[in-house]
C-alpha cells in the first residue's frame, strides 16, 4: 500500500518541481511506515524497506528546498503523534475512525529514523488511548465468548466434535483400558468416570488418550488439525520470529486439545460417575451401562454438555492466549483488539492553516 509506482512517481516529480524554499508541505501516506522504520526492535532490513516509499516522496520535497511540516496517515486505528526537536516534521497517525480500536501500548516511545545522512530521534508526545488504558483493555478478552459469540459457537462445535470422535474411537480400539485388569473392554468415558480429579489421574488419562491416538491414525490426524491450524494463525503475526510463532501456535493448539480432553473427563464424571450410579434409576431398572451410553438421553446430554462447556471454556482459553501472547511475545497486535470490537476512542483531525502557522487538533468524537 505504501509503495510508489512509476505513474505516481512521475506525478509527484512534476509537482515537486513547482516547490520553492518558502513552501511547507503536508505529506499524506496510506500507512504510517515511520513507526515500523523507527522501531529498533525490528531488524534493519525491515526498517529500511518500510520507509522507502515515504522517504522517496520526502526527498522530492526537500531537494527543492521546501520543508515537510507534517507526515499524516491513518491505517492504524488510534491516534499517535511523534515529534523531534532536531526536525521540524511532525509524524501523526490519525486512524481513530477505523472499524475497531487498535492498542497503543506497543508503540515505541522513541523512533530512530535513518536516512543517508543521519539518524533522527522522534519522541512519542501523545497517544489516544493512553498506553496504560490500552494494556487494561487487553484483559477484556477474558470475555472472548461474549464479544465473539459466533466464533465461540464454532469452538463449541469443534469441542463437541472431538469429544464424540475420541469417545467413538475408544469403542473400536483394543487398548483403551489401562486400568482394567480383566482386559481392555471399556471406553474412555467408562474409564475416566471412575477417576477423581487429581494430578496423578490427569497423567493417567493423558496416557490413555495417547493410546487411542496411537492406534487410530485417522483420529490422530483429525486431532492434529487444530494444532496445525493454530500454528498458521500464529505465523500471521509480525513482531516475533517464525520459530517463536510456531511454538506459541503449537502451545495454543495443544491447550485446546487438552482442554477438550478435560471437558470429556468432566462429562464422563457427570453422566456416568454421578448420573449412572448403582443406586440411580437407570441402573436399578436394569439398564446396562453400554446401553445407557448409547441411549438418546445420554447422547443428547453429551452433545449439550460438550457444546455448553466448549462455548465458554474454549472462548476463555482463546482470549487468554491472545492476552498472554501479546503481553509476553508482542504477538497478535491486531487480533487482541479486533476481537474486542471496541467502538470507543474514535477521533478525527481538524487542521487550521493560516499565512504563517499550521495547527492540528485531535478531536475525540465521543
Q: Which residues are covered by each model-predicted region?
A:
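Metal-dependent phosphoesterase/phosphodiesterase active-site architecture
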Residues: 1-25, 32-70, 76-366
Amino acid at each position: 500500500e505504501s509503495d510508489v509506482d512509476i505513474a505516481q512517481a512521475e506525478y509527484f516529480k512534476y509537482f515537486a518541481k513547482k516547490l520553492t524554499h518558502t513552501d511547507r508541505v503536508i505529506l499524506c501516506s496510506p500507512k504510517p511506515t515511520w513507526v515500523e522504520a523507527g522501531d529498533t526492535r525490528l531488524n534493519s532490513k525491515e526498517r529500511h524497506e518500510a520507509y522507502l516509499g515515504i522517504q522517496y516522496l520526502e526527498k522530492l520535497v526537500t531537494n527543492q528546498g521546501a520543508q515537510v511540516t507534517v507526515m499524516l496517515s491513518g491505517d492504524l486505528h488510534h491516534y499517535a503523534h511523534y515529534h523531534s526537536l532536531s526536525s521540524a516534521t511532525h509524524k501523526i497517525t490519525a486512524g481513530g475512525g477505523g472499524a475497531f480500536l487498535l492498542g497503543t501500548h506497543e508503540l515505541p516511545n522513541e523512533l530512530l529514523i535513518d536516512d543517508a545522512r543521519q539518524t533522527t530521534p522522534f519522541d512519542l508526545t501523545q497517544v489516544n488511548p493512553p498506553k496504560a488504558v490500552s494494556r487494561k483493555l487487553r484483559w477484556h478478552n477474558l470475555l472472548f465468548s461474549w464479544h465473539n459469540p459466533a466464533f465461540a459457537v464454532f469452538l463449541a462445535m469443534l469441542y463437541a466434535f472431538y469429544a464424540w470422535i475420541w469417545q467413538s474411537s475408544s469403542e473400536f480400539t483394543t487398548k483403551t483400558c489401562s486400568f482394567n485388569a480383566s482386559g481392555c473392554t471399556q471406553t474412555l468415558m467408562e474409564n475416566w468416570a471412575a477417576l477423581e480429579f487429581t494430578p496423578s489421574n490427569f497423567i493417567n488419562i493423558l496416557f490413555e488418550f495417547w493410546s487411542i491416538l496411537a492406534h487410530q491414525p485417522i483420529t490422530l490426524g483429525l486431532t492434529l488439525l487444530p494444532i496445525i491450524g493454530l500454528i498458521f494463525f500464529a505465523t500471521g503475526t509480525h513482531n516475533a520470529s517464525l520459530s517463536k510463532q510456531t511454538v506459541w501456535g503449537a502451545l495454543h493448539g495443544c491447550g485446546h486439545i487438552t482442554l477438550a480432553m478435560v471437558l470429556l473427563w468432566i462429562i464422563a464424571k457427570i453422566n456416568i460417575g454421578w448420573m449412572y450410579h448403582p443406586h440411580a434409576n437407570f441402573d436399578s431398572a436394569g439398564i446396562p451401562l453400554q446401553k445407557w451410553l448409547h441411549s438418546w438421553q445420554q447422547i443428547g446430554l453429551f452433545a449439550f454438555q460438550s457444546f455448553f462447556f466448549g462455548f465458554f471454556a474454549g472462548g476463555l482459553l482463546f482470549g487468554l492466549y491472545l492476552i498472554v501472547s501479546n503481553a509476553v511475545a508482542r504477538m497478535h497486535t491486531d487480533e487482541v483488539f479486533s476481537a474486542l470490537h471496541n467502538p470507543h476512542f474514535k477521533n478525527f483531525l481538524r487542521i487550521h492553516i493560516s499565512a504563517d502557522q499550521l495547527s492540528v487538533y485531535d478531536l475525540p468524537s465521543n
